[in-house]
Amino acid sequence: MVTILDGKAVSEKRLELLKETISESGLYPRLATVIVGSDPASQMYVRMKHRACERVGIGSVGIEIPGDATTQNVLESVTRLNRDTDINGILIQLPLPKRVDTERVIAAVNTEKDVDGFHPTSLGLLMSGRPRFAPCTPKGIMNLLAEYHITVAGARAVVAGRSIDVGRPMAALLTNADATVTICHSRTRDLPAELRQADILVSAVGKAHFITPEMVKPGAVVIDVGINQLNGKLVGDVDFEAVKEVASAITPVPGGVGPMTIATLMENTFAAAAMRMP
């Protein structure tokens, strides 16, 4: 019988543990979120992060910047947050409007406050096997695999998607955990054949029900990072009902990877605060 990897339940457990840890530490970590424009999905995600902060005892401040802002406007806000000694973590809510240079904004974040793990220095440390802050979604996935005692070392892992926020850091974390990793993308030849090699399959392609049973090795662990709309419903990259008949374990959408991402952000923010302890 397939195991449903319940990210919601695992994240609840981790958040409760973090709440206790923060309370016992005597620290008061603070997270600043920066959102540019009024995209409803981005606003919803930011609200969820602030609610999680409140729950575990992390202070939070939201910086809202008009959608017509320039790159320089956003950089000025980031600079102020970098200088604010009361702020431990800075999160830039992505995507930014096209007129804003995302790479410049991310690179402007103080690396000691880069709790999203997207700064070039953070990614470089991750690739070298010495991560300070790993991006929250890939790190959350690794925590979920560990919670269910899924063996990564020696496994053949395939990551579908090569984005800098999920695909590439996911591959790095799996490699650091001694998996044999393949990254697939839009130019991969015979993609189904590559995916069928996976003991652990991570899909981050952003296409509803893209992964079908024919692409999945029987008994594989399937991690669905996708968040897509299909016929008015929220679905993942994986055809869940069909693929669960083939997989040994699978994450649902919603309730799988998403909650783990937020829990990891909270953990990274506390870690950033703890790093500054004398």
From Swiss-Prot:
A GO biological-process term: tetrahydrofolate interconversion
Domain of life according to the entry: Archaea
Positions of NADP(+) binding: 161-163, 186, 227
Protein EC: 1.5.1.5, 3.5.4.9
Pfam (any one): THF_DHG_CYH_C
One cellular component term from this protein's GO annotations in UniProt: cytosol
UniProt keyword annotation of Lipoprotein present: no
Pathway of action: One-carbon metabolism; tetrahydrofolate interconversion
Catalytic reactions on record: (6R)-5,10-methylene-5,6,7,8-tetrahydrofolate + NADP(+) = (6R)-5,10-methenyltetrahydrofolate + NADPH; (6R)-5,10-methenyltetrahydrofolate + H2O = (6R)-10-formyltetrahydrofolate + H(+)
Keywords: Amino-acid biosynthesis, Histidine biosynthesis, Hydrolase, Methionine biosynthesis, Multifunctional enzyme, NADP, One-carbon metabolism, Oxidoreductase, Purine biosynthesis
Subunit organization: Homodimer.
PANTHER family attached to this UniProt entry: C-1-TETRAHYDROFOLATE SYNTHASE, CYTOPLASMIC, C-1-TETRAHYDROFOLATE SYNTHASE, CYTOPLASMIC-RELATED
HAMAP family: THF_DHG_CYH
Name of the molecule in the record: Bifunctional protein FolD
Organism (species): Methanoregula boonei (strain DSM 21154 / JCM 14090 / 6A8)
